[in-house]
């Protein structure tokens, strides 16, 4: 493996790219939230993009202008870039050979011990290596998937070298860690207007080509080593998750003292050292990133002889928050035999994603305690019902309220804010969405 750190600037040097994009042909492996947003935003920037996906039904849907999940703005991008022929979906990995670079955007789910499962990343690396073996031109591989620090250099690059017969460096192929920082529900905006672009590589040519790729985007670019880039992603999510768990724990104390934590959050958020973001106390965080990445980083720490006391506490606090909603409900009424409505199933508004959502744990606990559970969400009911089939889905918030003895509000969709929706029903609010006659908040 060649060590070709760019001598033009120090490690960690941040700059704004002034290079003119050469409009490379790009292949993206994976058409999930990250891969599809990445592919379509690059196509919108003028690149020719092929998005490679193993699920044939998803490929057919995409090429028929159908987005397989909810993400604001994605449908418009898909339709316009299919028309312009800058974007196409395929299940043929050999499409990589006709492109200049490949972005790996496959999932790295949690294993039972909390570690990140990188088998899909390594499978992609092996296939890339075999496909570029006979390709005469230079090829860049950028891993956007979240992986443990050291994965690119210890596993991905050796696999590509072995399968391709090429040497990593300035001649055969170049590799980089290029983590994403997209928020579901705001992913298109976040890709086109990022706070920073992180490129972790030791190869000058790979950095230059990735700089060209991001030239249309006006954002600071930081060049670091691959392990540092991999750690930046995990550490960023750990910091944000820590802020959420800390305000939730403070909120739990405030609740018992009769203090509204929202007033406390406003006051501490005005401190520029703290800032107002991620200070909304509630029933806990969910999604595909925070829980997985904090657990993954904790396991990296353990495997390297560091006891992750704070990382473990972030998860412990978060896993307790949904159950506080149930405990709060029990202060007001007997759950066994009651009809309980849940408004909001997605882990946040603007998405249909229910992965690690507080609603999952709450619904299962209510069912275990003998409640009949009615649910509504503006986007996430199908995905939720697949995981918790015993709930009863409602076609509107009004139906859910009408059929229920009490309501738990778990996602801050604007459609749940009107107090008149609830009448005289008891409302347990986990997100600070509304304020009704019979009302209690999880942290206020």
Residue ranges of each PLM-predicted region?
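Structural/interface elements that position substrates and couple domains in central-metabolism enzymes
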Residues: 2-444
């Amino acid at each position: 493996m060649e060590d070709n750190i760019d001598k033009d600037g120090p490690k960690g040097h941040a700059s704004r790219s002034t290079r003119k994009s050469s409009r490379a042909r790009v292949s993206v492996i994976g058409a999930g939230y990250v891969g599809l947003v990445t592919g379509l935003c690059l196509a919108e920037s003028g690149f020719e993009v092929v998005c490679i996906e193993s699920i044939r039904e998803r490929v057919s849907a995409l090429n028929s202008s159908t987005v397989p999940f909810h993400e604001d703005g994605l449908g418009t991008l898909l339709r316009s870039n299919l028309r312009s022929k800058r974007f196409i979906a395929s299940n043929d990995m050999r499409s990589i050979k006709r492109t200049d670079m490949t972005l790996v955007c496959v999932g790295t789910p949690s294993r039972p011990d909390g570690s990140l499962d990188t088998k899909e990343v390594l499978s992609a690396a092996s296939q890339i290596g075999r496909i570029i073996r006979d390709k005469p031109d230079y090829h860049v591989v950028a891993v956007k998937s979240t992986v443990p620090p050291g994965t690119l250099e210890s596993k991905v690059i050796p696999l590509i070298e072995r399968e391709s017969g090429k040497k990593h460096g300035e001649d055969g192929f170049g590799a980089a860690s290029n983590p994403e920082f997209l928020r579901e529900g705001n992913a298109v905006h976040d890709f086109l207007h990022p706070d920073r672009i992180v490129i972790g590589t030791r190869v000058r040519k790979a950095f230059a080509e990735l700089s060209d790729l991001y030239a249309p985007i006006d954002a600071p670019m930081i060049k670091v080593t691959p392990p540092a880039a991999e750690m930046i992603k995990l550490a960023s999510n750990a910091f944000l998750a820590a802020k959420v768990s800390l305000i939730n724990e403070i909120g739990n104390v405030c609740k018992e003292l009769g203090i509204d934590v929202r007033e406390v959050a406003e006051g501490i958020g005005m401190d520029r050292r703290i800032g107002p973001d991620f200070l909304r106390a509630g029933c806990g965080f969910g999604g595909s990133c925070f829980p997985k990445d904090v657990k993954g980083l904790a396991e990296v720490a353990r495997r390297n002889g560091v006891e992750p006391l704070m990382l473990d506490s972030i998860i412990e606090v978060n896993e307790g928050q949904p159950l506080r909603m149930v405990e709060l409900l029990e202060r007001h009424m007997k759950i066994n035999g009651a009809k309980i409505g849940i408004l909001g199933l997605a882990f946040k508004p603007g998405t249909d994603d229910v992965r690690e959502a507080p609603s999952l744990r709450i619904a299962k606990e209510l069912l275990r305690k003998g409640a009949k559970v009615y649910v509504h969400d503006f986007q996430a009911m199908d995905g939720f019902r697949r995981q918790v089939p015993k709930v009863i889905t409602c076609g509107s918030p009004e139906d859910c309220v009408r059929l229920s003895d009490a309501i738990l509000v778990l996602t801050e969709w604007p459609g749940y804010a009107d107090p008149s929706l609830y009448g005289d029903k008891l409302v347990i609010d986990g997100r600070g969405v509304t304020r009704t006659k019979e009302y209690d908040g999880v942290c206020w």
